[in-house]
Amino acid sequence: MSDMVTGLGITGGEDIDNAECVLVVGRNPYDADPIQWMALRRAEKRGANIIVIDPRRTPAVDHASLWLRPKPGTDAALAMAMMHVLIEEERYDHAFVERWTHGFSELAERVKSYPPAAVSYTHLTLPTILRV
């Protein structure tokens, strides 16, 4: 996110060119970041899975394999539900978490309050949330 402050892609931490799945959340790289937009298009050509989470239709939607349109203001609840699934189903890199994170057990406890079925106020169905 540091590139959002400096405006320079050189400080960003994303690695779109090597990603198998790219998550674009509430952002329009077509207008906001031409370099990131080009990387997103390369990822698409490579066959990467592109998921857009945004209530607005942006150019990225036309290149996405999945477009989620949550009710505005509910994106944090959606993120918590997604983390709930990842942690509950152990779909994360345990070694990475052990070595590089702090507070993971607290996060795991917190997301228990956000099972996907409990965040219907996002206006997304349970099957849609689970597809991500």
Residue ranges, per PLM feature:
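Conserved small/polar residues in nucleotide/adenosyl-binding loops
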Residues: 122-128
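N-terminal export/assembly segments and adjacent metallocofactor-ligating motifs
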Residues: 1-91, 107
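N-terminal leader/propeptide and maturation segments of large enzyme subunits in energy/redox metabolism
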Residues: 92-121
